[in-house]
């Protein structure tokens, strides 16, 4: 497991959590702009985590 893959998965987890908070706060405050930003951050986090997992798979084949 490479160091880059760990960083990608950690960044992804952070962005996903940040997005979930923004989404919930935006919902409670009735701020659709904040909700949209939260959904974008969650998607970004998922993609980063997937990239980290893919890097793990490729490094395992070496």
Curated annotation (Swiss-Prot):
Q: Which UniProt keywords apply?
A: Stress response
Q: Which domain of life is it from?
A: Bacteria
Start and end residues of each stretch annotated as Disordered: 1-62
* Residue ranges crossing the lipid bilayer per the database entry: none
Q: What induces it?
A: By phosphate starvation, via the alternative sigma factor sigma-B.
Instruction: Name the InterPro entries on file.
Output: CsbD, YjbJ_sf
Q: Specify one Pfam family.
A: CsbD
The record's family statement is: Belongs to the UPF0337 (CsbD) family.
Name listed for the protein in its UniProt record: Stress response protein CsbD
What organism is this sequence from?
Bacillus subtilis (strain 168)
């Amino acid at each position: 497991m490479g160091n880059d893959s760990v960083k990608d998965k950690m960044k992804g987890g952070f962005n996903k959590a940040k997005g979930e908070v923004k989404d919930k706060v935006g919902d409670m405050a009735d701020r659709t702009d904040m909700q949209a930003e939260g959904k974008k951050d969650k998607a970004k986090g998922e993609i980063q985590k997937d990239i980290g997992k893919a890097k793990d798979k490729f490094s395992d084949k070496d």
